[in-house]
């Protein structure tokens, strides 16, 4: 009798021990999961504040606007320099989907009468505007990335002077561009000097805006004004800032219809560009599809060495690295949706504080060393 009772007690003890161990394992797993979530949120916030941070391979905005999404960093890296006969080079950093940098008066601009050059992000699918024939006929513009929703997390630019010490003279200045831009500030054009507006070569860039900035003689009165020597460019980086306390996703359509009146001019033989009409809803719709206009832009003016085309006056050479961290959502019918990962949140109020902190330093250039 006593032996049977002991067996029952031992069995109960064993069950209690197993249950306790199981609970401890579950609690430990929950704690580990919470810790991993907290660490990932911290890393994602780090990328929000520093576009060149490598803290996470999934850059996202932890504001709870998505349960699952895909974050990635895309960039373009190359050498650029001022064009022959042009001692001033102009750069505009903007929050585009498949391109984020526009360079004017550069030696790399060798298409038609263009003075500008747009390097697109590596691996980007771009957009197709080959259907656009003239400024009077309606046409379709096609996005090729097949996103359902997308937004910029952060975007930035680093420049380094490549000239030797005896040729490192010159200086730079920069300002933030926060004024509201209009349709005429943006062009449908091609990246990487492509003569094919079809396929994945198309892009939208602020060509009209940089043309107006070129005529602005004095930048020093701007509140965000930053300046320095070309030899010290590696000590700073340039970043676009969000202009609101919240950041919504941009809904993407694979095909957008442009009425004939939405385009004011089309050139598909020399410069391969199309200009939008002021105030037209279709034009505004296309721009909003491929540019995250909730961010500002940064204009950089580089006062370079003289470039006469002959040694030793060959201008200034720069190493350019432009990165864009983006968060995208694919439709569940797209196979890329299987790569979605869980999206964490710190709450909209806490996220707004981080957005405000980003705008607190309004200098166009950010010291990094």
Swiss-Prot record:
Gene Ontology cellular component annotations, sorted alphabetically: host cell nucleus; virion component
Disulfide cysteine pairs (residue numbers): none
Keywords: Host nucleus, Virion
Origin superkingdom: Viruses
Transcription regulation keyword on record: no
Main location as per UniProt: host cell
Record localization: Host nucleus; Virion
Purpose of the protein: Self-assembles to form the virion icosahedral capsid.
Protein name per UniProt: Capsid protein
